[in-house]
Amino acid sequence: MTYLFLICAILAEVVATSLLKSTQGFTRLWPTVICLLGYAVSFALLAVSISRGMQTDVAYALWSAIGTALIVLIAVLFLGSPISVTKVVGVGLIIAGVVTLNLTGAH
């Protein structure tokens, strides 16, 4: 169940981050409200995941790594961000780091 809360936290964070550009510097009301609510929900669900037994280091590593990878994917596919070798290698290294953290008994 802790992983379900974590997945929902990641998705809320990804939605909020994806909306940042549409807030136009937090000058547009509804995109700003939805963005800030997304971040609040994300942190609350991350906290629930940790309070229900997931190790803090594992939860945060997964939350940040998967969120980062998804944001890069969304930026490339939908927001016009160019793909580059640097981005691919960077996301690969992030994923490798999270896998390494989990394999070394951090949980």
UniProtKB/Swiss-Prot annotation:
GO cellular component: plasma membrane
InterPro entries from the UniProt entry: Small_drug/metabolite_transptr, Small_multidrug_res
Spans traversing the lipid bilayer: 2-19, 29-51, 58-80, 84-106
Compartments reported by the entry: Cell membrane
Transport keyword on record: yes
Primary site of residence: membrane
Membrane topology of the entry: Multi-pass membrane protein
Coiled coil feature spans: none
GO biological process: response to antibiotic
Keywords of this entry: Antibiotic resistance, Cell membrane, Membrane, Transmembrane, Transmembrane helix, Transport
One of the record's GO molecular function terms: transmembrane transporter activity
Pfam families given in the database record: Multi_Drug_Res
Functional note: Multidrug efflux pump. Confers resistance to tetraphenylphosphonium (TPP), erythromycin, ethidium bromide, acriflavine, safranin O and pyronin Y.
Family of the protein in this entry: Belongs to the drug/metabolite transporter (DMT) superfamily. Small multidrug resistance (SMR) (TC 2.A.7.1) family. Mmr subfamily.
Name of the protein: Multidrug resistance protein mmr
Organism encoding this protein: Mycolicibacterium paratuberculosis (strain ATCC BAA-968 / K-10) (Mycobacterium paratuberculosis)
Gene that encodes it: mmr
